[in-house]
């Protein structure tokens, strides 16, 4: 029989030894094959930047303030988390220890983030903690304030630098993105209380109401590296950041909660997402010690959540974003506004002057406002709804009941904060959140009555589009 020169002969013993060696090699290679076949479903990166003004500035949140800031009690921060799924789809979350999100800031940051990093506007969320101890972000002559030119300049310079910092942070978080896992958990926290109380005369006053609706849930998203090192902890709560009312910059209870969580978890970036807290206040309030106590309480609730059985979040990122025209109830005539200018109520008269100035400058008053609604699907289980404005608690309670899926997280103060967003119940009742607060801005009137149905219907449509 002819043999090929390349085909060696082997004894039975040699054949057995070769087979054993082959089996060992395959066994050693199995972990590598397993990792390659089941790579981490996420990549993630997070960064934090101090945004406390270097100089005194006028502060946002309370119309009664008569002077600029007088120092810093607790630094303010902006933070960014970027998630990338296994298909390369990206989501960027930005949180800020500030009063709100101006529409112009959202538009500018979204445009730059898409151009520079390929993150679509629908996949960007910007949330404000709504602290009333931060700088004002927008001031114009329409507001009729003292030192208007200086305040316009300061607010404009601060906001322009903030926009640059937010874009930079998203880029840095994306550049840091590394293989990660994401887990969801939750607990509860009890210092928020409904602040709408009947005044006994058919109206409503701002006063703690222990019988009013609340949302005490504390949703938590933990992002960890594949080595188990925690990278970011995102947590939410539905409560106004109004423990404090002084003249020093501070993130209020939300700032203290983030500070405590980061101390408990070295290397972590803690990001706070305010919920549907338009009618929710922290109680008791008005002292620094109480702000610290509430912050510690919320941080403890986050620790309690992390100690429960967490739910792994796996899958892809899907997002939908729409601006819907929220109609105003009615548009005042020039004659009506001139009459209101003579009102003995200072704020009614001031509002009339602002709206008249707007009418003179723009030629007409808008019939509606472009209101942002965003729905995110993070993995297969988490539906995250973000709504603009100071949304009252009824929205998170209703959407939690009516949306499908095991996890529904609803955040307010996102992508634009233009005023209070009442539910139908609150609109019917009236009062501050029902429309009375509009006198402190430049909206021509309160919203039309079907605002809740319009928003909820849009949320459901967007959620269905992501199936």
Where are the regions that the model predicts?
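Anionic-ligand-binding alpha/beta catalytic cores of soluble enzymes and soluble regulatory domains
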Residues: 298
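Conserved beta-alpha junction segments in alpha/beta enzyme cores
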Residues: 37-127, 131-269, 273-277, 283-293, ...
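Bacterial N-terminal signal peptides
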Residues: 21-32
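Short, Lys/Arg-enriched N-terminal segments with co-localized hydrophobic residues
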Residues: 7-16
